[in-house]
A protein has these predicted regions:
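A detector for small-residue-rich transmembrane helices and their helix-helix packing motifs
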Residues: 1-198
Length: 198
């Protein structure tokens, strides 16, 4: 097994360390660094990035770090550290924009935390770059093509976002996927929604 590349390793360590701090002083960190809807009066500009370093539970942290390792490691080796960081930032910002829009429409006062937006951007990129790679998710443990995996999870996120009240920021996840899609198109020199040239 190849070693974890540096940016992915540092992010995994930083997120884990911050989560440990959350267990000690949760109110302080969440009030300053979670992504709060502007209407609450608790919003600060840096929160559109910092929220991605906080997590809501041990399981939340575990699955995000697992996904970061599974998909991010290979993409970092492919792109290099600088481009990889730029891509993660795009995913985090796009997810934040989507979540702020949804909370504004729904008049929500609940903050958002987690690297899931960046993770879904990585997932989308992996599916675009390695569409025929076979992967086996933890649940369901069924081998499937990366492209199929992305479509299934994207569809589930949309369905749960439209119908569910699970306390999960589904539209932030979808926003991360959109941000990842737009970055890949930009790097390829393609306009966002034009058809692929033959």
């Amino acid at each position: 097994m190849p070693p974890i590349p540096p940016v992915t390793k540092v992010l995994m360590l930083v997120c884990t360390a911050i989560f440990c701090l959350q267990l000690i002083v949760p109110a302080v960190l969440e009030s300053l660094f979670a992504l709060w809807p502007p209407a609450t009066g608790l919003f600060w500009p840096w929160q559109v990035v910092s929220y991605g370093l906080l997590h809501g539970s041990t399981f939340h942290l575990f699955f995000n770090m697992l996904g970061l390792w599974m998909f991010g490691s290979e993409l970092e080796r492919l792109w290099g550290a600088r481009r990889y960081l730029g891509f993660l930032l795009a995913g985090v910002l796009a997810a934040a924009a989507a979540q702020l829009l949804v909370t504004w429409i729904g008049r929500s006062s609940v903050p958002t935390v987690g690297a899931s937006g960046a993770l879904f951007a990585l997932l989308l990129a992996f599916g675009m770059l390695f569409p025929n790679r076979t992967i086996v998710p933890l649940f369901p443990p069924i081998p499937m093509k990366a492209r199929t995996f992305v479509m299934v999870f994207g569809g589930l996120e949309l369905l749960m976002g439209l119908t569910g009240r699970t306390g999960i920021a589904h539209f932030a996840h979808l926003g991360g996927m959109v941000g990842g899609f737009l970055m890949i198109r930009y790097w390829r020199g393609q306009s966002p929604f034009s058809r692929r040239r033959r």
